[in-house]
Amino acid sequence: MPMPFRLDPHEPFAAGLKRILMGEIAVARAAVAVPRAEQAAGIHRARRALKRARSVLLVFRPLIGEDYRRRRDVLRDAADHLSAARDADAMVASAQKLDDRRPHDGAGVVIGRLSRAAEIAHAQRPDTGRVAALLRIAEADAASLPLAPAAGRLFVEALGETYRRGRADWRKAEEEGGEDVLHDWRKRVKHRWHLSLLVVGRTAVTSRSIVGDLDELGELLGDEHDLALLVRRLGKEADVSGSKKAARHLAEEAERRRRKLARRACELGAELYGDKTRHFLQKLDGLATDA
């Protein structure tokens, strides 16, 4: 059974971080090796584990220097091989929710085509051999990581950097908005959430309530991103059985929903990113002294 994604307070920081990184890669390897009947659930588990692994790898960046990008890209490429079916499913779910809220006569045709595209994506089994090969590389990379003597300080620096960049993205989202800005912000939020989970309850800025709010913010931004994917897909809809009008209706509803989600995300962001970075770091001081 996989270990909890959490550092043991009695475990040295360095050993714990390395253990967790290797554990998440092992979870991903096991998840992509499941029988075909369990593939969808396995891919979901693998993608989540790889996201957590990439967050943990951030802590080791100062130790591995220029090789960080290669190691990160190995994890990212493995996840990318598993993304097609997930994105197709997300578009179907988003379109169905929009039509449930404000039905349109021709929406069923559009949703039906999206559903068939999702079925095709699932039928095209991902190259699990390639994914497994990438994960073996990632596993060897993780095993080679040194046990940093100042791992607590490195962890605080990594969490502080994800906060700093997330705060900049939040301010940019409030001022400009836009799909790319929100997508970048979501990535920073996820990194902060993952790193905070490792030390949940051990500082004021990694309390259970804040970790829960970060999870909620990530979900809001994730739903916004799924709608952005849907809007792009709807823009390519051919006029089959009069579906162009329905596709346009769904796209308009998606844009309206995206704006609402972005507003809610920015409001929650004000609570989670209101502190200046130096004040945030001060609240992590106790962790920096851990071995």
Stretches with model-predicted labels:
Residues 1-291:
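Function-determining surface determinants
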